[in-house]
Regions:
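Positively charged n-region of N-terminal signal peptides that target proteins for export
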Residues: 1-4
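Electrostatic cytochrome c docking/interface patches
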Residues: 33-68
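The canonical Cys-X-X-Cys-His
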Residues: 65, 69-79, 124, 138-142
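Hydrophobic membrane-insertion alpha-helices, especially the h-region
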Residues: 7-19
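Hydrophobic single-pass membrane-insertion segments
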Residues: 19-31
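Axial heme c-ligation environment in periplasmic c-type cytochrome domains
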Residues: 85-92, 112-145, 150-152
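Gly/Gly-Pro-rich "capping" loops immediately C-terminal to redox-active cysteine motifs
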Residues: 66, 79-111, 126-129
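Stable alpha-helical elements in mature extracytoplasmic
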Residues: 61, 102, 106, 134-135
């Protein structure tokens, strides 16, 4: 038998075995967080969407990020990234944990804007006047808030 034909038959048989195995053993849902949007209908417009615990101290980078956040982000995302009902989501939320939205996601969001995909607030426009370094410091501030609030 030709070696190429033998190799082809082997690959087909192996592929079939993998497909059969996957059909018999479907992937189990992970025990991650819910991606369902919470019901905020009982909250007043502009009300914070999260109760944010503030850490005892921030790193120097997070302190600079906090100042930049307050100038460029808090108008929509609220004080301490708690979000605002009807305006923008809280960034101190499981949805934005590092395993789901890495720090680069914040850089890209600020640079390019974001099409609404987790929440019903509409699209986020690009943020003018921030460098990548500024956004990385903002991300550091958000990560330290998230850590203080048990997000990761």
């Amino acid at each position: 038998m030709d070696k190429s034909l033998l190799l082809f038959v082997g690959v087909v048989v192996l592929g079939g075995a993998v497909l059969y195995w996957n059909a018999q053993n479907p992937a189990q849902p992970s025990a991650g967080h819910s991606m369902e949007v919470p019901d905020t209908s009982a909250l007043a417009a502009g009300a914070p969407l999260a109760d944010v615990a503030i850490p005892a101290s921030f790193s120097a980078e997070a302190q600079m990020g906090q100042r930049a956040f307050e100038v460029k982000c808090a108008t929509c995302h609220g004080t301490n990234a708690a979000g605002q009902n009807g305006v923008a989501p809280p960034l101190v939320h499981k949805t934005y944990e590092p395993n789901h939205h890495g720090d680069m996601a914040f850089v890209l969001a600020a640079k390019n804007g974001v099409q609404s995909h987790h929440w019903n607030f509409g699209n986020m426009p690009p943020v003018e006047g921030l460098t990548d370094a500024d956004v990385k410091m903002i991300a550091r501030y958000i990560r330290e808030l998230q850590k203080a609030n048990g997000i990761f």
